[in-house]
Amino acid sequence: MSKKIGLYWFTNDLRVNDNPLLEQASQQVDRLICLYCYPSITPFLARYAQQTQWGEAKKRFLNQTLADLDHSLSTLGQKLWVTPLLPYQALRHLLTQVEITDIYVDAVAGSDERQAIARIHQDFSSVHIHQQALHSLLSEPQLPFALEALPSTFTQFRKQVETISLSAPMGYPHVLPPIEQGWQLPLMDIVTEPNHSAFVGGEQAGLTHCQNYFSSLLPSRYKETRNGLDGMDYSTKFSPWLALGAVSPKTIYAMLQRYEAVHGANDSTYWIFFELLWREYFYWYARRYGAKLFRFSGIGEKKPLTSFYAQRFLQWKHGETPFPIVNACMRQLNQTGYMSNRGRQLVASCLVHELGLDWRYGAAYFETQLVDYDVGSNWGNWQYLAGVGADPRGSRQFNLEKQAHTYDPKGEFVAKWCGTACDKLNALENLALDSVDMVDWPIAASAYLLIHHPQNKESSS
C-alpha cells in the first residue's frame, strides 16, 4: 500500500490548538509538509495603498507568530516551511516534485486564496483538498441559510445565528506525521526582532493575553469602555491574534462562557459576543461577495461621488490633515500597527467625506499597516462607512469636532500622538486641504481660505 503524503497550507490559522484540520491531517496521512506562503504586496495593493512594503509593526507581529508556530510544530516533530512564492506557484512546485495525495487548507475568506485553491483543484484533480472553517464560530452547514442568501444586514444575520449552539474548541494534537523530505522550494528565514509593542505575536502570547483578560473584571464593563482611543484595557484587544488565527474565536467564546459562569452575564459580556458576531458576519460576507469586496461600487452598482487627490491621501496617511483627532489616530496606526475601533470610523469618515477620496485607498492602506488586518472585517467595514456595503442607511459621516470633544475632551490623546506637531498642524497656513490645484499649480493658503472660508476675509487681508 502506497504511503499518503499530506500538505498542510497554513493561511490565517497559525496555531496548533483548536485546529481540527491539523488533527484530521495527523490521522489521514503518513508524512506531512507544513507550508506558509509569506504575503506580498500585490499590484492592486501597491496601487491603492501607495505602499511597496508592509508596515514594520505588522511585519514584526506576523514574524513572531510564524516563529511561535514553528516552535509549536517542532515539539510535535514537524517544521513550518515559509516561502516567498505566491500560493499557486508554491503549491504547483511541490505537487510536481512530490506525490502529494492530500492538501489541507482553511476555508479562507480571501478571493485570491480561493482562486489559488480552485486552480490547484483544476490542474491536479487527483489530489484531495480538505477544507474546514477555522477562522469562524460556525461552519457553512451550520448556517440557517444558503451562503448566497446571506442576510443583507448584520442585525438580520445576528438574529438568525446568535442562538445556534457552538461546538467546544479542541485541544492540542498529540502527534503529527513526520516531515516529508526530498523537495526543493525557495524558502525564507523568519527573523524576529526585539518587541517593544503591547502586542506580541504568536499562539502562546495570544492565549496568555486572553486568559489574563478573562482573569480580570474588565469583561464586566467592556460596553462602557469600548469606545476608548488609547491603552490596553478599554477593549479586549483579541483582534490581532484572531486575525492571524493564532487564537480561534471558539476558544475565546469558551473563555467568555466560563467567565459568565463565575462572574455572571451582563450587557458588557454579551457585547463581547456581539463583537465576535460582527467579525463572523464579515467572514461570511467576504465568502459571499468575493472580489466585490474590492470594487469601487462595493456589493451594489452605485459608485460613490469621490475621486483621488494624491496630496490629500498623503496628508491622511501621515497624519497631517486639518483634523487633529484624525492626525493622532493615523500617527498611532503608523507607529503601533493598531487603532481603536472608534478611531477607524473617524479616519474612514474623514477620508471619504472631508477629503473626498475613493474609500479603497484607505482600506488598502489599512491592510498594509494593521497588525489585526482581517480581509472581511477591514474591507467590509470600509464599504459600510462609504455607503457601498451592508448598511441600509447609506454612508456614515461623523462630526469630527464633536467626536473629539466626546472621546478626547482634554486633548490628551491628540497631545500624546501629535506632540508639538499639533501647533504646526493647526497653524493658519496648514488649514488648507490642498496646496496645489488639479494641474499641480501651487495654491496659497490665504487664497484657499478666501474661497472656502469667506468669513475670514477681513482677518486675512
Swiss-Prot record:
Keyword field contains Flavoprotein: yes
Requisite cofactors: FAD; (6R)-5,10-methylene-5,6,7,8-tetrahydrofolate
GO molecular function, a single term: DNA photolyase activity
Photolyase/cryptochrome alpha/beta domain residues: 4-137
Entry note: cofactor: Binds 1 FAD per subunit. Binds 1 5,10-methenyltetrahydrofolate (MTHF) non-covalently per subunit. Binds the MTHF cofactor more tightly than the FAD cofactor.
SUPFAM superfamilies xrefs: Cryptochrome/photolyase FAD-binding domain, Cryptochrome/photolyase, N-terminal domain
Keywords: Chromophore, DNA-binding, FAD, Flavoprotein, Repressor, Transcription, Transcription regulation
Domain of life of the organism encoding this protein: Bacteria
Disulfide bonds: none
One GO term of the biological process aspect: photoreactive repair
UniProt similarity note: Belongs to the DNA photolyase class-1 family.
Function: May have a photoreceptor function. Binds DNA; probably functions as a transcriptional repressor. Has no photolyase activity. Upon purification from either V.cholerae or E.coli an approximately 60 nucleotide RNA is associated with the protein.
Name of the protein in question: Cryptochrome DASH
